[in-house]
């Protein structure tokens, strides 16, 4: 056997040649617009001329494995010195791969069963929900729903949709936290976080600020002061040059226009990837909140006679910015809009299907559970969710607990006719394709594709020579791909399609614009692996002189690269496994360049509008090669695709995008801080405090809580802070329980400036009825503005009825006897807090299961366990102790940097929310803390994924004595002013 290893080598060669997920079809046909192959056989099969059993084996069995990994294994095997040892290693490797493939099929079967089970679990309560409402549907409503997309998602542009006029002066807030964001010379492709989204949000900000009726646009991102990054990323404010739209003119003021606002959060000397931003988002929110409040008042002075001009919308881009937008929306009571860009559940399913990592490993790498929960929270808080395609809504968002197409359709229909939705709500899904900037459009050809004579004085752009130097024959049509070097972009399949098809190689050149790079050895592992694989394939197929892969290009040179492809009558190719937006396809069409695009995602709907190319299966390299050959070899087809693209591209312009965008937000009801109109109705001493101490300790007895309060007040007095320091009690207790607690301790309500009760659903201030405070003369004043602030989509009675029904189903089973363990607790309930008593905490369902159930039912609320898991509280989605503190900050002008929050070692299920932000946090450690209970052992993700416990703003002290408190104040540099 060792003397004849040809069979082994044939399998190894096949492994190297087989593409990821290669189809075993005999002919490769492109999809859409003529397809590409027609009835003729594949060029690759004609060229091959014979059937290879080894290749068939690999293409049928070895799917889903990265060729780079297999190639590295083959290199290691060939490095063996002894021929006998080498052959043995080769043989073992081949059979090991076969065994892995069999295991992978078993895993795929298990995964399919898991997905089926999850789908059934999700559909059951949704079926119950729709059946509950179906009895109230008008006759014929179901038929109306089925065919009308506007009923399904609320995305119709027809009817009496109000428009933004030049009289309106809107303030719009955009948020995009990750990557390197600046207005000029964008470093797109420098890393995995600096890509199309960065370009999109910057251009959106510029375009919106140029629209009539829009006064100011702020694009918030992270301030980056890390070494090796340009100083521009550390500038707090960067003005953006507005896009010039024809006939769009309006009067401007000092604070008008578009700006990038950079907020410092997280480690100041480090650049953080998006997966590591989660613990610092609340810190960003606090910084952004301060800026928005100041800017709203400044704009108000210019345009509103002194009344604050609060944001019309706060628009989050990507999951992390979705959380930030939700928190800011809740703090300011203004509408939220969300764009997901690339959704976490879709990525998770894709990674699980590959079978290389477990769910735990995926979460460790990508923090995927934080991302998915953030997207669910964005669904809870958003008025509008913007998608680029219908496929994104029906196939991606439909995976989430908080959205379901059929239920959304029914709820939209009920809202239209004013019917009762029983407290249920779903955000409006609207489809607005991305826009492109037409400012750099230069056509060197007429509509028939004939070259216009260039000006004698004009010079070719320098990037052209940088690309042309790679080619032996630069006059051939140029196939252009613009994509970052990541596995999902599928660049290696494109290179293999080009390399294996000799007629295509003879016809055209290939140009790969894969971002900017220095040395491959210094790149991110995934990017380096893709680039190494590309270079290996170029060498394997001997593509020297036929493939260009420049190391650097400027963002401003990208239009020139498109023009070069048009000049050579080439084509643009974009074949990732899935394309969320497809901005590069629109840019190519804008320059008159026909396209070959993936059939998965946004390109399908872009193609329906533009009809300027062919769609292909990104897994099928034969189809890619055939489509490219067809497009480049048939002159009439090329000219028709070019003409169609130029004729229809106006539908993807920024003016069109902004017109649709502004028409959507004009339908949103006006929401703004309720206290703006009745600022003086409550006289609260907290308004004049220099420092505020918030006591939010849940893990101690009532006796220890009283001692902590007393010692905190005494510590402030001894540090000469008593007159300038206010105290806030933040707890899950009701106001009645708080009053009883203070009475038993001999304390006065006036010892505090405010009381955050019922886990943040109620806010009270002490109110004196006489000149001398006493227990008999002190009452509590309810902040009704706060109630208006948090009532957004509160389910009310409909939510209560559903929770009562759910509570009756939670039982403890002892043999044949079932005993209910959760009961409604009217005594501890209030208007915005539904309380339930827990008889046996050991039988509590995990909180994430209850939250999942509420979302499936479209009941938007915040559920939490408190009192050592003996009480369940369900409150509005924008209510919490943390959010109540931000409300106090905005209403009474409290600087969060001067706030100290006291917490225990454990607490209620909202414990993690009390850490993050600009305020200081003191953890009281010691045996007086109750042990952690079950509510913290079933988290969606580890605490350290969302809390930066090593932050300088968080300290721990042993004990809670007066001296301990004073030591903490000194450590935090809290001093008398």
From Swiss-Prot:
It catalyses: beta-D-fructose 6-phosphate + UDP-alpha-D-glucose = sucrose 6(F)-phosphate + UDP + H(+). One of its GO terms (biological process) is sucrose biosynthetic process. InterPro entries: Glyco_trans_1, SPP-like_dom, SPS, SPS_C, SPS_pln, Sucrose_synth_GT-B1. It is an enzyme of class 2 (transferase). Activity is regulated by phosphorylation and moderated by concentration of metabolites and light. Its EC number is 2.4.1.14. Keywords: Glycosyltransferase, Transferase. GO terms for molecular function: sucrose-phosphate synthase activity. Induction: Circadian-regulated, with the highest expression 3 hours after the beginning of light period (in 14 hours light/10 hours dark cycle). It comes from the Eukaryota. Signal peptide: none annotated. Expressed in germinating seeds. Pfam families: Glycos_transf_1, GT-B_Sucrose_synth, S6PP. Pathway: Glycan biosynthesis; sucrose biosynthesis; sucrose from D-fructose 6-phosphate and UDP-alpha-D-glucose: step 1/2. Residues 124-159 are annotated as: Disordered. CDD domains: HAD_SPS. Belongs to the glycosyltransferase 1 family. Homodimer or homotetramer. PANTHER family: SUCROSE-PHOSPHATE SYNTHASE 3-RELATED. Plays a role in photosynthetic sucrose synthesis by catalyzing the rate-limiting step of sucrose biosynthesis from UDP-glucose and fructose- 6-phosphate. Involved in the regulation of carbon partitioning in the leaves of plants. May regulate the synthesis of sucrose and therefore play a major role as a limiting factor in the export of photoassimilates out of the leaf. Plays a role for sucrose availability that is essential for plant growth and fiber elongation. This is Probable sucrose-phosphate synthase 3.
